[in-house]
Amino acid sequence: MVQRADINNVLSEIRNLRTQMMQNQRIEQDQSVRGRIDGPRQVQETQEVPSFSDMLGKAVNNVHEVQSQASELRTAYEMGDPNVDITRVMIAAQKSSVSFEALTQVRNRVVRAYEDIMNMPI
């Protein structure tokens, strides 16, 4: 009989949860209908999403800056600047090389996507 009481308790809890869920759904539906009738309650500010060309332009500028910095370090090392050591020059040169290679790969992918779109049948 003890097990039966436990089952009844569980069933009553399930019923209570179901009625609570139904009430919450009704409240949400009422609020959504009220929102459609009254209009939006708050005005959401639109976030400016950068365009692809802006992002690509920033990437190109970033690569240019990295290459300029590597060139300046290389020149300073060649001139005998004691504050510039060979490790900094080599690391800057590798960063420059990697960033330029990444930019080249992005360009290749964009060109390939453009060609795929142009070859699509209408």
Curated annotation (Swiss-Prot):
Q: Which UniProt keywords apply?
A: Bacterial flagellum
Tell me the domain of life: Bacteria
Name the GO terms of the biological process aspect. bacterial-type flagellum-dependent cell motility
GO MF assignments:
cytoskeletal motor activity; structural molecule activity
Task: Output the InterPro entries linked to this UniProt entry.
Answer: FliE (IPR001624)
Annotated compartments: Bacterial flagellum basal body
Q: Does the keyword rRNA-binding apply?
A: no
Sorted alphabetically, the Gene Ontology cellular component annotations on this record are: bacterial-type flagellum basal body
Q: What is an example of a Pfam family matching this protein?
A: FliE
Chief subcellular site?
A: other
Give the similarity note: Belongs to the FliE family.
Descriptive protein name: Flagellar hook-basal body complex protein FliE
Organism, scientific name: Marinobacter nauticus (strain ATCC 700491 / DSM 11845 / VT8) (Marinobacter aquaeolei)
